[in-house]
């Protein structure tokens, strides 16, 4: 049986004691470390997600304001998440010793590697390239009462993208 003292200690423990690694500021990073094409795509996606904010308003924000609204800067500093999502290739080295890379690997029936490719920042642009490499078979099912099969992908693209973003 648990004592009242032990119960009190457990209940007073912080729920999220660990720091968010991706939210930490990269000390020597600047806006110049970010890819302009990646920022443009992020801005376009932001306008889709936040459609209640007029597009003209979002377009009028300077890069620093936009990154702040996205939560990719903290107190004006560029976060690790900003480098991972929007950074130029050479900016990834500012995150060392972390290796900012996803490796796609194709294996044969004996699990021998027959092909591979490395992908790196900016992941907002490369995630679609990675997705295109993943074998996602089209499944066909014959429902009753029809001559035409229903088709669906083996894996939902949204789910795969979510897993890639969480990498």
Where are these regions (language model features)?
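Conserved N-terminal catalytic/coupling substructures associated with nucleotide/phosphate chemistry
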Residues: 1-167
